[in-house]
């Protein structure tokens, strides 16, 4: 028995969950300690009204564990028992990623359980899932993509069965009727009753933190193409954590999703995207791809060898620009 579903953030604001086919919907609620998805409550209430299984997630910034957990729980509010609670652990805009993955996540999960009696689920990419083998009584939601080709729901996602997880996210390029754009597609390994077991509390008296002050409104959004803004973000012009959220305003989700895509996508797929022009050339490409640059560029060069006879007046920079590479 399995369920098909989607996960959404403000990037899909306004999506009509009454017409998009899905058994469950996981909705981004919060990030850090100062961001609430502006479409969170609308999407949640609509999904609830049309009978979807529900999940709510917090995107970690890797700051103070208790503060981030309390902020999330305050915005979960009276939805406890209705929705699965989830921690989203990714590299983008996360100060603790790579340095204390297990310790941070385990502490956050334990704290949320102590306050709610609900065992949250942990989302992470397959490449770091081994770090959470002994995470305790918390399910894993693992992201691993075969490629970036458009796809509908899959009965048997690539690499299924190679590891155990509660939920598998297998594409960020899902295409479903009722929505004109890409969606994250997921498979839950269980029934609706099993989903409900993840959401239910095993405590009788639960007190969640009070609702925090309404977050300050986002600043005016910076202008520019997504590649230009990602480049500036990687250079540090918009800061990290709460500063990045504030400075990017309504462009934040768009930019952060682009950066996160680079972290989780395979080298082969990134190389294909380089050839399509998605990451620009020269210093822009090198900066945007970050630590993935060398492996991706090697793949591009290996599969796209070209030869050029130097002419009088040529420069290395000019040749590199012409062929979309570096020197």
Residue locations for each model-derived region?
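LysM (lysin motif) carbohydrate-binding repeats in extracellular/periplasmic proteins that recognize
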Residues: 250-254, 281, 291-298, 312-327
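Primarily a LysM-type cell-wall glycan-binding module
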Residues: 223-238, 266-279, 303-326
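Substrate-binding cleft of extracellular glycoside hydrolase catalytic domains
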Residues: 1-118
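Residues within the helices of the helix-turn-helix
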Residues: 246, 287, 317
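Glycine-rich, charge-decorated loop segments at or immediately adjacent to ligand/cofactor-binding or catalytic sites
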Residues: 67, 127-137
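Aromatic-lined carbohydrate-recognition surfaces of secreted/lumenal glycan-active proteins
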Residues: 117-130, 142
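Primarily N-terminal secretory
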Residues: 211-222, 260-268, 287-308
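Functionally critical loop-and-helix segments that line ligand-binding/catalytic clefts
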Residues: 1-19, 135-220
């Amino acid at each position: 028995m399995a369920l098909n579903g989607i996960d959404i953030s403000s990037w899909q604001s306004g999506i009509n969950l009454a017409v998009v086919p899905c058994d469950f919907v996981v909705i981004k609620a919060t990030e850090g300690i100062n961001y609430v998805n502006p479409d969170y409550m609308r999407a949640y209430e609509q999904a609830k009204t049309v009978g979807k299984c529900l999940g709510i997630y917090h995107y970690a910034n890797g700051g103070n564990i208790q503060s981030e957990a309390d902020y999330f729980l305050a915005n979960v509010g009276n939805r406890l028992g209705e929705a699965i609670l989830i921690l989203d652990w990714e590299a983008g805009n996360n100060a603790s990623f790579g340095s204390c993955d297990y310790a941070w996540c385990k502490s956050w999960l334990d704290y949320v359980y102590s306050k709610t009696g609900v065992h949250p689920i942990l989302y992470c990419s397959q490449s770091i899932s081994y770090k959470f083998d002994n995470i305790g009584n918390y399910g894993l939601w693992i992201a691993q993509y075969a490629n970036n080709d458009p796809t509908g729901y899959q009965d048997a996602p690539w690499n299924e069965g190679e590891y155990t997880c509660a939920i598998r996210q297998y594409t960020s390029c899902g295409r479903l009727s009722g929505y004109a754009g890409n969606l994250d597609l997921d498979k839950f390994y269980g029934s609706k009753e099993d989903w409900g077991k993840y959401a239910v509390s095993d405590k009788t008296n639960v007190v969640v933190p009070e609702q925090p002050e309404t977050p300050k409104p986002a600043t005016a959004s910076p202008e520019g193409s997504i590649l230009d803004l990602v480049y500036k973000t990687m250079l540090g012009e918009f800061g990290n954590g709460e500063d990045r959220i504030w400075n990017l305003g309504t462009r934040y989700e768009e930019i952060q999703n682009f950066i996160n895509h680079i972290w989780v996508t395979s080298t082969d797929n990134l190389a294909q995207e380089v050839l399509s022009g998605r990451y620009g050339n020269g210093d822009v490409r090198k900066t945007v791809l970050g630590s993935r640059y060398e492996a991706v560029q090697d793949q591009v060069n290996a599969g796209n060898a070209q030869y050029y006879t130097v002419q009088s007046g040529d420069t290395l920079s000019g040749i590199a620009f012409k062929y979309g590479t570096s020197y």
